[in-house]
């Protein structure tokens, strides 16, 4: 069974959009996929239904999305829209790294189908004084789906994220480009450039919500 960590080349790139699309695609084919969003900054309880975790809950078929429901997949929620280590400190709290990893592992072990763990921000965002999202991924030992944008600068940002992940021996299952307006070049050109620069054995690079991406998801669900 395949489980994936959803991270990105930066913040506000579309991790939740891509993760929710993966969940909806699998569930439409009767694959019992689930997702976690364990850490969130910029979270407002009154807007729980439109939060990242709320969007994932709706993709999983939840009819009632409120703060209590969000807490089941997002235990560490902070109001300030800043780096999670800073958001936690500003709230007088911290993100206990071992507890974070244990929470995810318990959910993965109990999963009946594919489990997605959506990170926070980009791959190198700090979680506390010593840990980043990359450390979180490495501790879980699951493959990454790296979300990239179509904006100016995305090629450099994506290649840097790939290098950072590879430096820790983290397997990248796929790179998914989430087309973001305005697009400085056609998204297919971005895909071609990434493939040229990702090394001799590059991970597959897809454009979100395309037949090729959906076919890859179908194959991943059968592993």
Curated annotation (Swiss-Prot):
EC numbers, comma separated: 6.3.3.3
Ligand binding (ATP): 12-17, 52, 118-121
InterPro entries in alphabetical order: DTB_synth_BioD (IPR004472), P-loop_NTPase (IPR027417)
Keyword tags: ATP-binding, Biotin biosynthesis, Cytoplasm, Ligase, Magnesium, Metal-binding, Nucleotide-binding
GO molecular function, one term: dethiobiotin synthase activity
Primary site of residence: cytoplasm
Localization annotation: Cytoplasm
Pfam families, per database record: AAA_26
Catalytic activity: (7R,8S)-7,8-diammoniononanoate + CO2 + ATP = (4R,5S)-dethiobiotin + ADP + phosphate + 3 H(+)
GO annotation terms (biological process): biotin biosynthetic process
Protein's pathway: Cofactor biosynthesis; biotin biosynthesis; biotin from 7,8-diaminononanoate: step 1/2
Binding residues annotated for Mg(2+), in chain numbering: 16, 52, 118
Residues bound to substrate: 41
Domain of life: Bacteria
GO cellular component, one term: cytosol
Active site: 37
Cofactor: Mg(2+)
Record text on subunit structure and interactions: Homodimer.
Function according to Swiss-Prot or TrEMBL: Catalyzes a mechanistically unusual reaction, the ATP-dependent insertion of CO2 between the N7 and N8 nitrogen atoms of 7,8-diaminopelargonic acid (DAPA, also called 7,8-diammoniononanoate) to form a ureido ring.
Family as reported in the entry's similarity comment: Belongs to the dethiobiotin synthetase family.
Name of the protein this chain belongs to: ATP-dependent dethiobiotin synthetase BioD
Species of provenance: Acidiphilium cryptum (strain JF-5)
């Amino acid at each position: 069974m395949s489980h994936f960590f959803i991270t990105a080349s930066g913040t506000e790139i579309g991790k939740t959009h891509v993760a929710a699309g993966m969940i909806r695609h699998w569930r439409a084919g009767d694959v019992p996929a689930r997702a976690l969003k364990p850490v969130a900054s910029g979270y407002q309880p009154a807007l729980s239904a439109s939060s990242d975790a709320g969007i994932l809950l709706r993709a999983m078929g939840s009819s009632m999305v409120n703060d209590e429901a969000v807490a089941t997949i997002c235990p560490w929620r902070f109001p300030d829209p800043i780096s999670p280590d800073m958001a936690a400190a500003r709230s007088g709290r911290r993100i206990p790294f071992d507890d974070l990893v244990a929470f995810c592992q318990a959910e993965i072990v109990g999963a009946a189908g594919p489990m997605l763990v959506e990170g926070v921000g980009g791959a190198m965002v700090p979680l506390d004084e010593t840990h980043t999202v990359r450390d979180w991924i490495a501790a879980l030992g699951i493959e990454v789906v790296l979300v990239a944008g179509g904006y100016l600068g995305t090629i450099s940002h994506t290649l840097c994220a790939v290098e950072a992940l590879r430096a820790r021996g983290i397997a990248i299952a796929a790179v998914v480009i989430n087309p973001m307006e305005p697009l400085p070049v056609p998204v297919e050109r971005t895909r071609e450039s990434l493939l040229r620069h990702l090394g001799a054995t590059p991970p597959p690079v897809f454009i979100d919500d395309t037949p090729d991406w959906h076919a890859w998801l179908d194959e991943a669900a059968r592993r």
